[in-house]
Amino acid sequence: MSKNSDALLWYHGKITREVAVQVLLRKGGRDGFFLIRDCGNAPEDYVLSMMFRSQILHFQINCLGDNKFSIDNGPIFQGLDMLISYYKVISDGLPCKLVDFCVGKIAPLYALKYGLDTRLHLACEEKNPNTVKELLQDSVIKENVNARSISGLTALHISCSNGDNDIVAMLLNAGADASAIDANGRTPVQVVCFYNHASTLHLLISKGSADFLKRSPNNGWVPLHEAAMRGSLECVKVLLSFNASMYPRSLDGDTPRDLALQYENYNVVEFFDNYPVNQPKTSITQWLHQNLDRNGALIILQNASMADGSFLIRSSIKCHGYYVLTLVYEKKTYHFQIKSRADRWFYIDDGPLFETLPHLVDHYMQYADGLPTLLQFPVPSAENRKRPLPPTPTKNQLKLPVPPSRPIKNNNGLPQPLPYPEFTNESDSDIFTRLECEKEKPLPKLPRPVVNHTEVPNSVNVGQKGDQTMKNNAQQNIILKESISFGKELGVGEFGSVIKGIWLSPGGKEINVAMKTLHKDKMVQGEKEFLREALVMSQLNHPCIVSLLGVCLGPPMILVQELVEMGALLDYLMDYQPEIQEVDLKLWASQIAFGMMYLELKRFVHRDLAARNILLANKKQVKISDFGLSRAVGTGSDYYQAKQGGRWPVRWYAPESINYGTFSTKSDVWSYGITLWEMFTFGDLPYGEMTGNEVVSFLEHCGRLEKPDECPIHTYSIMLSCWHIDPNKRPTFNELHSTFSTDPEYEDVRIYRDRIK
């Protein structure tokens, strides 16, 4: 038996409570001695029986579906193995931590996040349909068809990644769960979209009844997001043929079209833009009520027998464009706000966007998609009950402002992000009084959870408390607008400009400065990020990092930084290649590693390390700049998970950052390797003319940038170590800095550095 399987021997199957007590007492042990058994009352639940102070206590482990488990109201875990691992570290409601287990048998592999590699997994990996067919004749193997491998994959996930339709069909016939999630939170549908297996996708939905609206717990993507990001146009077509919503939103607020645009899949963008919008199947006369409050809605639904799925929609008297869906489920009424942006995009909570209210109703009549049940029985108003209901509404009948056939676009051609409406128990009057002016305010992004229950410090949170913290910290170094004068523009970007200026310090000294400003149309969106960047920089003090002198609150808001005279390293590399020696490149590499080591110690991740963001003070000194994407990581965590969308520099990003939005010092190390490559190619674009999507595919197939002509073998080996697929096997910045400080290969750098001190 393998070491991995030995760790899973805590399961005792269908033993009774009394037998569990006898087994634990007979085996003996200290506090925290435990076993897991089946729950007699609930077939999908389990029971934790454990010893504490010579007594045996029992705790029901509730199965919440989707291989998720929890004890009472405690944390939710994917897999029993993750639940046990957690309670071995912290008691968190149990009388003590779990310690040793009473040896039983192998736990059910379908109830784990990380199981064992079975013969079925291996046969699927080898694409051997005959072996798979033979194995599925075994009743035990068939019963465990949803078992997870040591990598957290079901057999169906493996075959879907291969696009092996014959094996997929056999697995579905054997009862494979077409909506199960793997260790990365992806369903088989998301896997086939990732690998662009359109025929397999059709098979999963048509034969396996796969849930193609299921969201990834990591980023909130549905399969259409995955297909759009990968440029899998045929998969996009299949999903839309099954009436998938065109505009679901991720946790970042991105629609599939947004991702297609970000990853330069312009054929997918064009397809979305030209896809015909179907006429809605329902009419507002079937379910819309005017001048109706919550109590009135309840009375109408009670008179309509309160059948599950009965519903109506009522408009707000005070706030035009807002609606409330009142839905009956198990004799209770549920109220969901329906918001819209400029009477155009309608949505419930973090659900998809719809071009009209009837389109929203159509969707939820077909898919519950977060609601407690389908919309089934529309209840018309008294006025409309007296007239025949039209089978299909026309635009004139809608009596609602008709939106354009495609998403609203902002100046960048991107669909505008929409807010996350809170579910509330307030009265309708309170809701809409509070929201009356919200349409004029900047719309918030969707929240997403902090990883591993580790709270990111307030200073980097997006919420109101975090905003106030940022403002308070920034105001410690306020610079009056009257004390600065503006000079020439040094550079311009998507969100703002950098302007050379002079600051008259409180001591009366004139100091040359660089001032970062926002474009007028980016004021609302960018001010919070400016404050965030100011907060990050205010906590840093290092010779290899650009210093923040203060913040001018304006208007406009300005970040006032030290002026780094020679500008971006990228420009210098391209413009002055003949003047740059190998020792210069090595010196700069050592200084960048030194500055990043400092960030590593301060528990910051930069997230945008690139030659364009390294500035030259002089030929002998570089400084790391541009902390607009930088984030702190919480105590007890080594990584940060992105909460915001936007355009990411994919060419500089590690695979885990591209795929899962996970950033750490180790993802910064990957970017450091790309920056080294830029330096030794004198400013070449990483991956040349590849699109963002092609870069992702190149990396997944173990592709790496080639050695630059002017790069020593030893330095290229450092780059390759930075690009290891396993983040834990990449060097730390401390190790990188040590290499430049102690390795004989870089003796010339140390001599040069000592000479210029």
UniProtKB/Swiss-Prot annotation:
Key words, A-Z: ANK repeat, ATP-binding, Kinase, Nucleotide-binding, Phosphoprotein, Repeat, SH2 domain, Transferase, Tyrosine-protein kinase
Residues annotated as the enzyme's active site: 608 (proton acceptor)
Family that this chain belongs to: Belongs to the protein kinase superfamily. Tyr protein kinase family.
Polar residues compositional bias, start-end: 455-467
Species this chain originates from: Hydra vulgaris (Hydra)
ANK repeat spans: 115-147, 151-180, 184-214, 219-248, 252-281
Expression tissues: Epithelial cells.
Functional summary from the UniProt entry: May be involved in signal transduction.
Molecular function (Gene Ontology), one example: non-membrane spanning protein tyrosine kinase activity
Region Disordered, annotated ranges: 381-407, 444-467
Superkingdom: Eukaryota
Binding-site list for ATP: 490-498, 516
Protein's name according to its UniProt entry: Tyrosine-protein kinase HTK16
